[in-house]
């Protein structure tokens, strides 16, 4: 049962009763629990977003209802917890973040399952991944050591590695990351991979020390929108030749490779990097690594103008068994730059058009060269 005070707040907030307020009202609004961030609390019933002052639903600092609940629980704001649940927030998210026994009891009274802390954590993590709820996940797990410690250490890392390889997560880390950083980078990577603009902007604002890492991750995942934004709007600059190896390591990463090339990276060096990766050394022996996605990157570098006719590259290409057409093209001396890629363009939408056209004509282009040569 909700108190008259909570129900009154609900009606007043939904009707935007505090949209025009005087400075003298601030203290009263704060004491009544009607202040959120830097202004009176607001709520959009259509978007299910909690706002502050004149903030719009699309503002980077606006909160989805479940995130607002998590924040209120962490601050033990009893009336707001009740209010957010009344609007439809999932109280099970709240019990995970309760720091006091009193708040935990309140969450249970509002409908939280007390067994959730024992049996629901794993499924919650997986569900958040499926729904790409990056900011909610970070609000729940980041800096919530008591919850992170409920995960068995081995199971916790296996869970994350099962979905994404840890290469990009451990980028530039000289020692094992603490769980907080591990979780943060994991969810940040999801935001970049799926180009979730609001989470990316929110996280980049909150964690500016990860700017270089963010740019590298965007290159690795081929997110040209984020590369362009970081490089030209935020002036986060790294040497294109340092970024290119990251682009090359992600299978079929034409967007990332092209963008580094357009920024000035040496495409011959990129091809050499790929060949070294294919011929990686294990226990003193050269092990031939055959992966279609990596070979796709090799072919793309050649299409961008890399020279495939050096001794080391020749030896590797002749060992290629899966891509027969590429091997045949090499033997006939027909691996060459693709005419559509001769321009260096940096506008993301135009880059996507070029790559789309290239992918449409790539196989036809190769077969045409081979057909003409065999006549």
Curated annotation (Swiss-Prot):
The processes (GO biological process) annotated in the record are: taxis
InterPro entries given in the database record = ASFV_MGF360 (IPR002595)
What is the recorded function of this protein according to its Swiss-Prot or TrEMBL entry? Plays a role in virus cell tropism, and may be required for efficient virus replication in macrophages.
For this chain, the family text in UniProt reads: Belongs to the asfivirus MGF 360 family.
What name does this protein carry? Protein MGF 360-4L
């Amino acid at each position: 049962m909700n108190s008259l005070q909570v129900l009154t707040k609900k009606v007043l907030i939904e009707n935007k009763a505090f949209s025009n307020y005087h400075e003298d009202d601030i203290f009263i609004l704060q004491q009544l629990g009607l202040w959120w961030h830097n202004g009176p609390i607001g709520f959009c019933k259509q978007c299910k977003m909690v706002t502050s002052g004149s903030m719009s639903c699309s503002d980077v600092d606006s909160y989805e209802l479940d995130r607002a609940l998590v924040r209120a629980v962490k601050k033990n704001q009893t009336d707001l917890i009740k209010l957010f649940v009344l609007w439809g927030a999932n109280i099970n998210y709240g019990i995970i973040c309760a720091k006091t026994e009193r708040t935990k009891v309140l969450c249970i009274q509002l409908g939280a399952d007390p067994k959730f802390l024992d049996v629901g954590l794993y499924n919650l993590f997986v569900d958040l991944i499926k729904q790409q709820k990056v900011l909610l996940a970070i609000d729940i797990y980041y800096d919530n050591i008591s919850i992170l410690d409920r995960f068995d250490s081995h199971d916790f890392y296996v869970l994350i590695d099962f979905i994404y390889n840890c290469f990009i997560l451990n980028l530039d880390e000289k020692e094992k990351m603490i769980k907080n950083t591990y979780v943060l980078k994991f969810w940040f990577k999801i935001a970049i991979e799926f180009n979730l603009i609001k989470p990316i902007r929110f996280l980049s604002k909150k964690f500016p020390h990860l700017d270089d890492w963010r740019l590298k991750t965007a290159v690795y995942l081929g997110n040209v929108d984020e590369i362009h934004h970081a490089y030209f709007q935020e002036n986060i600059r790294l040497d294109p030749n340092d970024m290119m190896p990251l682009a090359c390591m992600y299978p079929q990463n034409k967007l990332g490779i092209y963008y580094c090339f357009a920024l000035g990276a040496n495409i011959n060096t990129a091809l050499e990097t790929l060949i070294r990766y294919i011929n990686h050394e294990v226990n003193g022996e050269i092990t031939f690594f055959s992966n279609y996605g990596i070979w796709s990157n090799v072919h793309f570098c050649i299409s961008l103008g890399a020279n495939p006719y050096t001794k080391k590259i020749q030896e590797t290409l002749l060992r290629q068994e899966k891509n027969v057409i590429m091997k045949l093209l090499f033997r006939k001396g027909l691996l060459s730059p693709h005419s559509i890629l001769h321009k260096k363009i940096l506008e993301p939408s135009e880059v996507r058009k070029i790559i789309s056209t290239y992918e449409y004509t790539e196989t036809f282009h190769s077969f045409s060269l081979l057909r003409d040569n065999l006549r």
